[in-house]
Amino acid sequence: MNSRLVLLHGWGATSDDLEPLGRSLAAAIDLPLEVVALAAPHLHPQPPGRQWYGLFPADWDAVPAAVEALQERLKAITRHGPSMERTVLLGFSQGGAMALSSGCSLPLAGVISCSGYPHPNWQPAEQHPPVLVMHGRQDAIVPSTAMDGITERLRSDRCETISFDNGHTIPEEMVQPMLTFLKRVLKGS
């Protein structure tokens, strides 16, 4: 049975940013995995980068519409090919925040947030999908304390956290924990 991994890039990046990671995960997992890298809908102040919503200053009022728009894109994608229940959402930084806000109220197989943060008024569904939260202890862009704000809002039996010695990045040593998570949520679904 086919599965899908949807990638959400961070603020100022493009959809190409996470594609090497997605290809690496797809090559290493022993099941068919389609990789889709979505581009944020808005231009970053310094093109060609993109943004899910304005961040400097933070436009928190735009978040609900951004989340709704992303959820509609995910629903459209899953009308063909792998279902929502066979889809994992993986986001980095602002993309991680969007993955959490959008994915935790959808019937996804799982959500992976890398160096993400909780949106101010985010309240995940009680029955949210399994979540993997990864964050660097030396992250100078999104402080590692953001991980606490995420885990406080999620059910502990549905959320796994990993902190690592690095900054605002996804280091190579995090690929294996991602693979383990993907295998668990996709083979069980």
Regions found by a protein language model. Give the residues of each.
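Gly/Ala-rich beta-loop-alpha elbow adjacent to hydrolase catalytic centers
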Residues: 90-95, 99
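Conserved serine/cysteine hydrolase catalytic core
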Residues: 118-128
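Active-site signature of alpha/beta-hydrolase-fold catalytic machinery across serine-
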Residues: 20, 101-102
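Short beta-strand/loop motif that positions the catalytic acidic residue
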Residues: 132-135, 139
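A conserved short beta-strand
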Residues: 107-118
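C-terminal catalytic histidine-bearing segment of alpha/beta-hydrolase fold enzymes
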Residues: 55, 144-189
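Serine-hydrolase catalytic machinery in alpha/beta-hydrolase-like enzymes
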Residues: 1-84
